[in-house]
């Protein structure tokens, strides 16, 4: 039998519409966990950067967009059904050590985090959801279903995998509804031997605390590399005071834009020709240095391209290089799912949609102050007209929800 994991996050930088009540949203059950939140944050950041480097290596000169937290959660759910070396490989790649943490604490920490992120009432909308589509002929252990439901709020559905097109439609319709139509299709060409599909969803809808004025947006050049440029819609904001840090050691500028509520986006702009140097330095300590060094700074003019990027990854080609191998092979031991060693993971599909545009707060809070020349200092201008990085974080624990490398703002 084969298990497929489908992961489909969407990050939307605009407030159009509201999120419906039919999403997989669950109230926070404030359970204590022995896994320290700072430890979980560092572990998740370490995994995020390791995965980023592998995706960037395998996709040179292409946009990279992914949700490390979404991928971690899907793998953690799979690990609930794993034993032996299969389990150890997954947890080690996620940066957990079973000699230092109890497995129960790991899952409680993850589940608690996902519930906290999904709490209603925040002005930033974050929806997390997990669904398991199980072939009607597959006998899944009650304990596995109970644990996935209790720890990760996984909703289980039965399907007929002998009719793959019907099952694909069932799964894709569910994904389309959960992502507010941003991801139209997650699975296609299901293999006949597939007997279970795990779907993980993370939907982020953020509104800028200080919005860009659409009247200022204009067509401009974005320099993909030294030889090629593309036309983009360049957003502009004037007289903005926002956290900023100039990292001379790594030759990059770091700027934070806040969303209303409890999230923010960190934009990292390497100097020309210094992207690889910045990428090589990505580790939890670097992120901590940047965040600790941010100070409010008056930006006279900020230029940021409007973004609409989608990516599609087959992570079964990437995760083995990070150390997760057994689960994709005949050696897979997922006997805590069915009670037998006859199940392996065939695919891990990760689809992401990243949209960022001008609109921000519900109040039309003004950005309308015009630039006034000052004597004594040159104007501070930050222009994102070449490749840059983005890390979207929730202020609860500063976990990276989404990470992106923007090579071409209008490309896939």
From Swiss-Prot:
Keyword match Transferase: no
CDD domains: serpinA3_A1AC (cd19551)
Signal peptide: 1-20
Region (RCL): 360-386
Keyword annotations: Glycoprotein, Protease inhibitor, Secreted, Serine protease inhibitor, Signal
Site feature location: Reactive bond: 374-375
Subcellular location as annotated: Secreted
SUPFAM superfamilies, A to Z: Serpins (SSF56574)
GO CC annotation terms, alphabetical: extracellular space
Pfam families, per database record: Serpin (PF00079)
Chain positions carrying an annotated carbohydrate: 97, 177, 262
Statement: the UniProt record of this protein carries the keyword Signal: yes
GO molecular function, one term: serine-type endopeptidase inhibitor activity
A single BP term in Gene Ontology: response to cytokine
Primary localisation category: secreted
InterPro entries with a match to the protein in the record: Serpin_CS, Serpin_dom, Serpin_fam, Serpin_sf, Serpin_sf_1, Serpin_sf_2
UniProt note: domains: The reactive center loop (RCL) extends out from the body of the protein and directs binding to the target protease. The protease cleaves the serpin at the reactive site within the RCL, establishing a covalent linkage between the serpin reactive site and the protease. The resulting inactive serpin-protease complex is highly stable. Variability within the reactive center loop (RCL) sequences of Serpina3 paralogs may determine target protease specificity.
Note from the entry: The single human alpha1-antichymotrypsin gene (SERPINA3) is represented by a cluster of 6 individual rat paralogs.
PANTHER family attached to this UniProt entry: SERINE PROTEASE INHIBITOR A3A-RELATED, SERINE PROTEASE INHIBITOR, SERPIN
Family statement drawn from the similarity comment of this UniProt entry: Belongs to the serpin family.
Name of this protein: Serine protease inhibitor A3M
Gene this protein is translated from: Serpina3m
